[in-house]
Regions:
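Short, conserved catalytic-motif segment at the N-terminal edge
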Residues: 40-97, 119-124, 178-179, 253-254
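Short, surface-exposed loop or secondary-structure junction motifs
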Residues: 80-84, 137-334, 339
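Short active-site loop at a secondary-structure junction
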Residues: 57-67, 86-144, 184-195, 265-268, ...
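Bacterial N-terminal signal peptides that target proteins for export
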Residues: 2-15
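Bacterial N-terminal signal peptides
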Residues: 13-24
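Short, gly/Ser/Thr-rich active-site loops of penicillin-recognizing serine hydrolases
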Residues: 357-375
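Boundary at the C-terminal end of the N-terminal hydrophobic targeting segment
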Residues: 28-30
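Short, well-ordered beta-strand elements
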Residues: 329-330, 339-357
């Protein structure tokens, strides 16, 4: 006896339902396995938590977020303490902090992308791309700006550093320093300079034909899957933004003063999360933003004209640990925050620390966390 049409339909429906259930279970199992693979072992997490807690207590840091990259994947992120004491808001992976000078490697990556594409000559005078920066007593090149060898000055005073004025563009921000003479002949001395990176941002605009923020959004942030990063603004409502603090000479914790970073977006004017910066590290280590040979060029210590190595590459602080591993990274410090991005590219490691205390010392902590991860 042949099964009826309705019976065959019920059998087919049951079969399809079974397949859907099996597929759902398989996807869930795969997702669970992926989540487990993307996390650190519990014992390492406990060690990191204890280390972070002790350091926060020692330095009186109100809030902190840490993210870890291992085997070139984001493995773990967590918040500690308070992102906002007055409103009793705990720090978390989604807490948004100012980056400080970690903006510099981002801008350097943008410049080196243009170099790879043949749009930027690192050894041409910067005025070829940034005519808004006047010619000086000596020629200045983009390579020298990248390595802090251009002789462009840093902050002149606390009033300048604590500026509350809004600057509408990268070129307008140059007005703060562009007419000042160079501190030294380019190539002869290492002079760390945030203002120099404003010139670099102007170079990126000239070489790309785009506004600086648009270029980094399209060419750095999107390919790296950085979802929360944006140009800082004291006026905009930015969800999950951390309040910032400082400790006075008498040891009293106070709110940070207002400061507008619009004059230095390329060198210190972004906000984001620790997870975003971890994704930036992953994108670099997996060659999604630049070719490997370009990264090696950036990670090589620059030299002054007399042949002496500096501790800075093209946009990155570079060093070797006593055990021989090379490290690449950058610190950040400004009103409201202290930050650190530590990478050991040969080991596929990165540690990001973002805190809401000015003047916090985070470099040693980042290395110690990295040592725990690599054990």
């Amino acid at each position: 006896m042949k099964p009826s049409t309705s019976t065959r339909a019920r059998v087919r429906a049951a079969f399809v339902l079974c397949l859907l259930l099996l597929s759902s279970v398989s996807r869930a199992a795969a997702q669970q396995a992926a989540q487990q693979a993307a996390t650190l072992p519990v014992e390492k997490v406990k060690q990191i938590e204890a280390l972070v807690g002790a350091e926060m207590a020692k330095q009186k840091i109100p809030g902190m977020t840490v993210a870890v990259v291992s085997e070139r994947r984001v493995r773990w992120a967590a918040g500690f303490g308070m992102q906002d004491i007055e409103n009793n808001v705990a720090a978390k992976p989604a807490t948004v902090y100012r980056l400080g000078s970690i903006a510099k490697p981002i801008t350097a990556v943008a410049a080196m992308q243009l170099f790879e594409r043949g749009k930027l000559d690192l050894d041409a005078p910067v005025q070829k791309y940034c005519p808004a920066f006047p010619e000086k007593q000596w020629p200045v090149t983009t390579r020298q700006v990248l390595g802090h060898l251009a002789g462009i000055r840093h902050y002149k005073s606390d009033d300048e550093f604590n500026s509350t004025r809004f600057y509408a563009s990268v070129a307008e921000g140059l007005n703060m320093f562009k007419d000042d003479p160079l501190l030294s002949e380019p190539g002869t001395k290492y002079n760390y300079t945030t203002h120099g990176y404003s010139v670099l941002g102007c170079v990126v605009e000239g070489a790309s034909g785009q506004k600086f923020a648009d270029f980094v959004n399209e060419n750095v942030f999107r390919p790296a899957a950085m979802e929360r990063i944006r140009v800082d603004s004291v006026a905009d409502i930015i969800p999950n933004r951390a309040q910032g603090y400082r400790v006075t000479d008498k040891g009293v914790l106070t709110n940070s003063p207002l400061a507008d970073n619009s004059y230095k977006v390329p060198g210190g004017g972004f906000v984001s999360t620790a997870e975003d910066l971890a994704r930036f590290a992953v994108a670099l280590q997996t060659d999604r933003l630049l070719k490997r040979e370009t990264l090696e060029l950036m990670y090589a210590p620059q030299k002054t004209k007399d042949g002496k190595e500096t501790s800075y590459g093209l946009g990155w602080g570079v060093a070797k640990r006593p055990t021989g591993e090379r490290t690449v990274g950058h610190s950040g410090g400004q009103q409201r925050v202290s930050t650190f991005l530590h990478m050991q590219p040969d080991q596929g490691l990165a540690v990001v620390i973002m805190s809401n205390l000015e003047g916090a010392r985070l470099g040693a902590l980042a290395q110690q966390i990295g040592d725990i991860v690599l054990k």
